[in-house]
């Protein structure tokens, strides 16, 4: 079903990004679904630490570094 979220576990915190450092770039391991076991980079807003479970609406996109304009 397309409206279901996919769980992903944070395995590494890469660093802060964005104009004021408001986003954190993390590497997550997809826990279920067709991309199970794949590790991708995502940008996360809010507090996050290694071991947290994120619910991703989309697993195909990888994060790119957010630049300062």
UniProtKB/Swiss-Prot annotation:
Q: Which UniProt keywords apply?
A: Ribonucleoprotein, Ribosomal protein
Q: In terms of domain of life, where is this protein from?
A: Archaea
SS bonds (residue pairs): none
What GO CC annotations are associated with the protein?
Answer: cytosolic small ribosomal subunit
Gene Ontology terms describing biological process: maturation of SSU-rRNA; ribosomal small subunit assembly; translation
Alphabetical list of Pfam families matching this protein: Ribosomal_S28e (PF01200)
Query: Its Gene Ontology molecular function terms?
Result: structural constituent of ribosome
InterPro entries from the entry?
A: NA-bd_OB-fold, Ribosomal_eS28, Ribosomal_eS28_CS
**NCBIfam families, per this entry?**
PRK04007.1
> To which protein family does this belong?
Belongs to the eukaryotic ribosomal protein eS28 family.
Instruction: Tell me the protein's name.
Output: Small ribosomal subunit protein eS28
Taxonomic lineage of the native organism: Archaea, Methanobacteriati, Thermoplasmatota, Thermoplasmata, Thermoplasmatales
């Amino acid at each position: 079903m397309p409206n279901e979220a996919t769980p992903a576990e944070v395995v590494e915190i890469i660093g802060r990004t964005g104009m004021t450092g408001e986003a954190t770039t993390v590497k997550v391991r997809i826990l279920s679904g067709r991309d199970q076991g794949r590790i991708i980079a995502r940008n996360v807003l809010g507090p996050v630490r290694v071991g947290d479970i994120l619910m991703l609406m989309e697993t195909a996109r990888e994060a790119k570094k957010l630049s300062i304009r």
